[in-house]
Regions:
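Acidic, contiguous segments within the catalytic cores of piggyBac-derived transposases
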Residues: 1-156
Protein backbone atom coordinates (compact mmCIF):
# COMPACT_ATOMS: atom_id res chain seq x y z
CA UNK A 1 0.00 0.00 0.00
CA UNK A 2 1.10 3.57 -0.59
CA UNK A 3 0.03 6.80 1.11
CA UNK A 4 0.31 10.18 -0.61
CA UNK A 5 -1.50 13.43 -1.22
CA UNK A 6 -3.75 13.78 -4.22
CA UNK A 7 -5.68 16.62 -5.81
CA UNK A 8 -9.29 16.58 -6.97
CA UNK A 9 -9.69 19.38 -9.51
CA UNK A 10 -12.19 22.06 -8.45
CA UNK A 11 -12.72 25.54 -9.93
CA UNK A 12 -15.46 26.83 -7.64
CA UNK A 13 -15.28 28.66 -4.33
CA UNK A 14 -14.33 26.72 -1.27
CA UNK A 15 -12.67 27.77 1.98
CA UNK A 16 -10.28 24.82 1.92
CA UNK A 17 -9.34 24.90 -1.79
CA UNK A 18 -5.61 24.23 -2.15
CA UNK A 19 -2.88 25.13 -4.62
CA UNK A 20 -0.19 22.50 -5.23
CA UNK A 21 2.20 23.70 -7.95
CA UNK A 22 3.92 20.31 -8.36
CA UNK A 23 0.70 18.42 -9.16
CA UNK A 24 -0.80 18.10 -12.66
CA UNK A 25 -4.09 19.47 -11.27
CA UNK A 26 -2.86 22.58 -9.47
CA UNK A 27 -6.08 23.90 -7.90
CA UNK A 28 -8.67 21.85 -6.07
CA UNK A 29 -9.46 19.77 -3.04
CA UNK A 30 -6.46 18.12 -1.41
CA UNK A 31 -6.98 14.58 -0.15
CA UNK A 32 -4.74 12.13 1.66
CA UNK A 33 -5.06 8.79 -0.07
CA UNK A 34 -4.07 5.18 0.58
CA UNK A 35 -3.85 3.00 -2.52
CA UNK A 36 -3.11 -0.62 -3.32
CA UNK A 37 0.36 -0.85 -4.90
CA UNK A 38 -0.45 -3.67 -7.30
CA UNK A 39 -3.76 -2.34 -8.67
CA UNK A 40 -3.50 1.40 -7.99
CA UNK A 41 -7.02 1.20 -6.55
CA UNK A 42 -7.82 3.87 -3.94
CA UNK A 43 -8.62 2.02 -0.71
CA UNK A 44 -9.52 5.08 1.37
CA UNK A 45 -9.02 8.83 1.46
CA UNK A 46 -9.42 11.75 3.82
CA UNK A 47 -10.18 15.32 2.72
CA UNK A 48 -7.74 17.97 3.96
CA UNK A 49 -9.72 21.02 5.02
CA UNK A 50 -6.85 23.37 5.83
CA UNK A 51 -5.23 24.28 9.13
CA UNK A 52 -8.49 23.55 10.92
CA UNK A 53 -8.35 19.99 9.49
CA UNK A 54 -7.79 18.42 12.88
CA UNK A 55 -5.75 19.32 15.89
CA UNK A 56 -2.45 17.69 14.99
CA UNK A 57 -0.77 15.47 17.55
CA UNK A 58 2.71 16.38 18.84
CA UNK A 59 4.08 13.99 16.20
CA UNK A 60 2.64 16.09 13.37
CA UNK A 61 -0.03 15.84 10.70
CA UNK A 62 1.90 13.25 8.66
CA UNK A 63 1.85 10.88 11.64
CA UNK A 64 -1.89 11.43 12.13
CA UNK A 65 -2.70 10.84 8.45
CA UNK A 66 -0.72 7.57 8.27
CA UNK A 67 -2.22 6.34 11.51
CA UNK A 68 -5.79 7.09 10.41
CA UNK A 69 -5.52 5.72 6.86
CA UNK A 70 -3.69 2.51 7.83
CA UNK A 71 -5.90 1.68 10.82
CA UNK A 72 -8.09 -0.91 9.01
CA UNK A 73 -4.98 -2.63 7.62
CA UNK A 74 -2.87 -2.83 10.78
CA UNK A 75 -1.96 -6.14 12.44
CA UNK A 76 -2.18 -7.94 9.10
CA UNK A 77 1.46 -7.81 7.98
CA UNK A 78 0.94 -5.26 5.18
CA UNK A 79 3.78 -3.04 3.93
CA UNK A 80 3.09 0.71 3.61
CA UNK A 81 5.21 3.10 1.51
CA UNK A 82 5.22 6.88 1.82
CA UNK A 83 7.38 9.92 1.17
CA UNK A 84 9.39 12.22 3.43
CA UNK A 85 6.37 14.33 4.43
CA UNK A 86 4.97 11.41 6.42
CA UNK A 87 8.22 9.75 7.56
CA UNK A 88 9.57 9.91 11.07
CA UNK A 89 10.73 7.66 13.86
CA UNK A 90 7.43 7.81 15.83
CA UNK A 91 5.25 6.61 12.93
CA UNK A 92 7.72 3.87 12.04
CA UNK A 93 7.73 2.57 15.60
CA UNK A 94 3.94 2.84 15.82
CA UNK A 95 3.43 0.82 12.63
CA UNK A 96 6.04 -1.77 13.66
CA UNK A 97 4.22 -2.22 16.99
CA UNK A 98 1.01 -2.82 15.01
CA UNK A 99 2.51 -5.56 12.79
CA UNK A 100 2.68 -3.26 9.77
CA UNK A 101 5.89 -2.87 7.79
CA UNK A 102 6.78 0.58 6.49
CA UNK A 103 9.32 2.24 4.20
CA UNK A 104 9.84 5.77 3.02
CA UNK A 105 12.30 8.52 2.26
CA UNK A 106 13.18 10.72 5.23
CA UNK A 107 14.74 14.12 5.87
CA UNK A 108 17.88 14.10 8.01
CA UNK A 109 16.52 16.79 10.35
CA UNK A 110 13.75 14.57 11.81
CA UNK A 111 13.74 14.05 15.58
CA UNK A 112 15.42 10.90 16.82
CA UNK A 113 17.71 10.38 13.85
CA UNK A 114 21.43 10.17 14.62
CA UNK A 115 23.33 13.43 14.28
CA UNK A 116 26.00 11.57 12.30
CA UNK A 117 23.45 11.12 9.52
CA UNK A 118 23.18 14.90 9.02
CA UNK A 119 26.93 15.34 8.88
CA UNK A 120 27.64 12.29 6.74
CA UNK A 121 29.15 13.28 3.39
CA UNK A 122 29.36 10.32 1.06
CA UNK A 123 31.27 9.79 -2.16
CA UNK A 124 29.18 8.86 -5.20
CA UNK A 125 28.11 5.22 -4.96
CA UNK A 126 28.89 4.97 -1.22
CA UNK A 127 26.32 4.11 1.44
CA UNK A 128 25.89 3.89 5.21
CA UNK A 129 23.21 2.65 7.57
CA UNK A 130 22.10 3.34 11.13
CA UNK A 131 19.94 1.33 13.48
CA UNK A 132 18.63 2.18 16.91
CA UNK A 133 19.57 -0.38 19.57
CA UNK A 134 16.79 -2.93 20.22
CA UNK A 135 14.76 -1.57 17.33
CA UNK A 136 13.62 -2.89 13.96
CA UNK A 137 13.97 0.57 12.42
CA UNK A 138 16.82 1.04 9.96
CA UNK A 139 17.95 4.23 8.22
CA UNK A 140 20.00 3.80 5.06
CA UNK A 141 21.71 6.62 3.21
CA UNK A 142 23.50 6.50 -0.13
CA UNK A 143 24.72 8.93 -2.70
CA UNK A 144 23.70 8.78 -6.32
CA UNK A 145 23.47 12.26 -7.85
CA UNK A 146 22.19 13.50 -4.48
CA UNK A 147 22.22 11.91 -1.07
CA UNK A 148 19.11 9.77 -0.51
CA UNK A 149 17.86 8.73 2.94
CA UNK A 150 15.50 5.80 3.39
CA UNK A 151 13.87 4.58 6.60
CA UNK A 152 12.28 1.18 7.00
CA UNK A 153 10.61 -0.57 9.92
CA UNK A 154 9.88 -4.20 10.63
CA UNK A 155 11.15 -5.55 7.33
CA UNK A 156 14.71 -6.31 8.41
Amino acid sequence: MAVDESMIGFDGRLSFKQYLPHKPTKWGIKVWEIADCSTGYCLDFDVYTGKAYEQASPNGIGYDVIRKLTEPYQNRGHHVYFDRFFSGLPIMEYLKDHDTYASGTIMTNRKGLPKALKKKKLAKGASAFYSKENSDVLVTTWKDKKQVNLITAGSL
